[in-house]
Amino acid sequence: MTEAELIAKIHAEAGELIADACRSSSVKPEFLAALIANETGAQFSEGGLLGASHARRFEKAVLAALWEVLMGRKAAYGSIGRKDLLLYLLSGKVARDGAGEGPSTVPAAIPADSLLRLDRLASSAGLTQVMGYHVLEEASGCDSVEDLTVPARALRESIRLLAEFAQRYQLDLAAEFPPLFTCWNTGSPNGKTFDPGYVANGLRRMQLYKDLTSAVNP
């Protein structure tokens, strides 16, 4: 499948979802579409919207960092503390607004599915490959990692995270696309993307999507 065909497929299968997600945000639909192409383009080419929505990528370094928090060697990973992790791992529940206080120590025995939950927190999932641990954050609209496999919820979570990047680094969501792509891939506008062509690919795909949208809706 050519790049133009991939963008056309994303437009056909996810165009309305993308437009809905961007409606109350400064994020451009073409940026979100390019993010999907960058993150799950291969899965979208093969399995369409459903295939891309269920894509996952395990991050060993994130698992190690979460384990450090879980064992009390670090106070937190970002805004996620030990109690947040333990509550989710043991019950599958997310603590928000002070609700659902979790245990402060790791119990002697834990359910087997707790290990799967930890693995899921250390994996990216969904159309734009949001890291699972983000669902534990106070501002998240997700109740579990599995929500990231639901396209509409994954895109809303993506919009939230992009807005946080924009606020943290004083970026214009509607204009400063190269640093936003870099933030998404590395966590910082000054990071080094794993794929040297990540930003250039994103910008090119943005233009393809924008041109296609203009042609379909003149």
Could you tell me what each predicted segment is?
Residues 2-217:
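Catalytic glycan-binding domains that act on GlcNAc-containing polysaccharides
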